[in-house]
């Protein structure tokens, strides 16, 4: 049922203190409205939770971004455009900057606010896992004064929070302690832009001496609230990376979440995606180690276009991908680089994908199935392929024969070689995957092969940055 505008009262005080006083006079009666991106949706459905609306849009006390030596303090009224364009947010809190760029379209980013996203309490909100990973603190204000609350403790259930009826979020505080961490984020949705997440991940980690010194992994759309994977983090911290640890981390992460079946996805799919994303993050973290990526990126950012494209070509094998990546420089950090790689790859043509596929050897062989792209450093690509297929190369003769037979059947059916991210997978696992994928139709299999190539490219980029 639609609502009647005459049933609502709307006022716009000129100061934060006036808003706080109003909320204190009638706790729970007034609904603060910032950018109002959800107002018309709720209004049209007759689901606005209050009849009295008070505007907090454009209040100067809520729109600042203050930077000190120890922390950055983001006003709750700052928009996603403010966040994605802010220099310190981009350089030191890239997970949040990337999430801001994912949130809706440009119009939504110009109006939507970080504080509003937090209070709206959607478990699918893109920015909230980043706040969990960075261990944000909220500053809450009311007529009773000010209090700080860890963001991790803010959500108590689906669409439920610890915000009192007379309180507002004034600011979000992030400590500046993660500049040495690798940042990893990914959003899985029905399309590349303006889509509600099926799963989103924000993770940071730091290696020291081959051991995971620190790790924080947060997820959205997999539980009634945004979720930190505490058990998975405890499993990984202090450990060196082994295939068995990655396998156990995949299992632990999938068991730690509480996904549901809904209009966007299924619980089973979400669990599988979470396992894959956690494994990918760990592999990239391991490949990067303790390297200072800024030096590698700074050098590559300054190369001529052709030289830059040729240098990263072995990571993927597609000239289209390599040249588009080189044309997007400079990249501020590895998170931005990897995000651009994913987006560039997804927007290539099927012909570009096939070019990348042809640069790989068949599973169980050492030479590319067809000639590698021109200008590719084939020796580097060959070395990486051997590393990726190490377990297959060590398998028995019977299994290699079965793999060769399945490869032939696959190529006859789909017209290109079988592509799988083989890192950490045993030969029997790969053969089982190959046989399962033989049941796909051509379009489904092409997209699955492209997804596997995306994962391979990410891992190889980590190795390239480590050279």
Describe these PLM feature segments.
Residues 16, 93, 243-246, 305, ...:
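Residues at or immediately preceding the N-termini of alpha-helices
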Residues 76, 224-228, 300-304, 315-318, ...:
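Short acidic alpha-helix initiation/capping motifs at coil-to-helix transition points
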Residues 392-467:
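C-terminal non-catalytic interaction appendages of large macromolecular assemblies
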Residues 275-280, 284, 343, 416, ...:
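Short, residue-level hotspots on alpha-helical faces of the histone-fold
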Residues 1-293:
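C-terminal structural segment of proteins
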Residues 294-315, 320-406, 456-467:
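Aromatic-anchored, charged helix-turn/loop surface patch used as a conserved interaction hotspot
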Residues 89, 105, 318, 330-331, ...:
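Alpha-helix boundary/capping and short turn/kink residues
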């Amino acid at each position: 049922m639609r609502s009647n505008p005459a049933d609502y009262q709307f006022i716009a005080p000129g100061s934060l203190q006036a808003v706080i006083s109003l909320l204190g006079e009638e706790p729970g009666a007034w609904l603060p409205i910032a950018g109002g991106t959800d107002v018309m949706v709720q209004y049209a459905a007759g689901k606005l939770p209050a009849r009295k609306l008070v505007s907090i849009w454009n209040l100067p006390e809520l729109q600042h971004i203050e930077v000190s030596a120890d922390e950055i303090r983001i006003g709750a009224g700052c928009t996603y455009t403010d966040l994605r364009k802010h220099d310190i947010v981009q350089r030191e809190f890239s997970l949040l900057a990337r999430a801001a760029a994912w949130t809706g379209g440009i119009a939504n980013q110009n109006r939507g606010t970080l504080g509003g996203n937090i209070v709206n309490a959607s478990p699918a909100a893109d920015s909230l896992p980043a706040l969990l990973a960075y261990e944000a603190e909220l500053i809450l204000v009311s007529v009773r004064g000010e209090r700080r609350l860890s963001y991790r403790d803010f959500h108590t259930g689906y669409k439920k929070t610890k915000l009192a009826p007379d309180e507002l979020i004034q600011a979000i505080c992030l400590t500046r302690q993660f500049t040495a961490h690798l940042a990893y984020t990914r959003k899985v949705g029905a399309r590349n832009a303006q889509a509600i997440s099926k799963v989103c991940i924000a993770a940071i980690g730091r290696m020291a001496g081959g051991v995971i010194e620190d790790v924080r992994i947060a997820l959205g759309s997999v539980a009634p609230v945004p979720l930190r994977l505490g058990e998975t983090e405890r499993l990984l911290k202090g450990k060196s990376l082994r295939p068995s640890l990655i396998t156990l981390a995949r299992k632990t992460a999938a068991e730690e979440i509480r996904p549901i079946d809904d209009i966007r996805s299924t619980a089973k799919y979400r669990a599988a995606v979470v396992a894959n994303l956690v494994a990918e993050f760990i592999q990239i973290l391991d490949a990067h180690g303790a390297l200072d990526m800024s030096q590698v990126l700074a050098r590559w950012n300054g190369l001529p276009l052709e030289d830059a494209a040729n240098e990263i070509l072995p990571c993927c094998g597609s000239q289209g991908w390599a040249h588009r990546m080189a044309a997007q420089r400079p990249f501020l950090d590895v998170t931005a680089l990897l995000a651009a790689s994913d987006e560039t790859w997804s927007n290539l043509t099927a012909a570009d994908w096939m070019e990348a596929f042809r640069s790989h050897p068949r599973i169980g062989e050492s030479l590319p199935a067809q000639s590698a792209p021109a200008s590719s450093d084939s020796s580097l690509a060959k070395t990486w392929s051997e590393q990726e297929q190490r377990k297959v190369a060590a398998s028995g003769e019977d299994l290699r024969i079965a793999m060769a037979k399945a490869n032939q059947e696959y190529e006859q059916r789909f017209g290109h070689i079988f592509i799988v991210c083989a890192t950490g997978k045993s030969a029997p696992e790969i053969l089982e995957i190959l046989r399962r994928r033989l049941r796909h139709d051509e379009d489904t299999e092409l997209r699955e092969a492209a997804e596997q190539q995306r994962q391979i490219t990410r891992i190889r980029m980590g190795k390239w940055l480590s050279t």
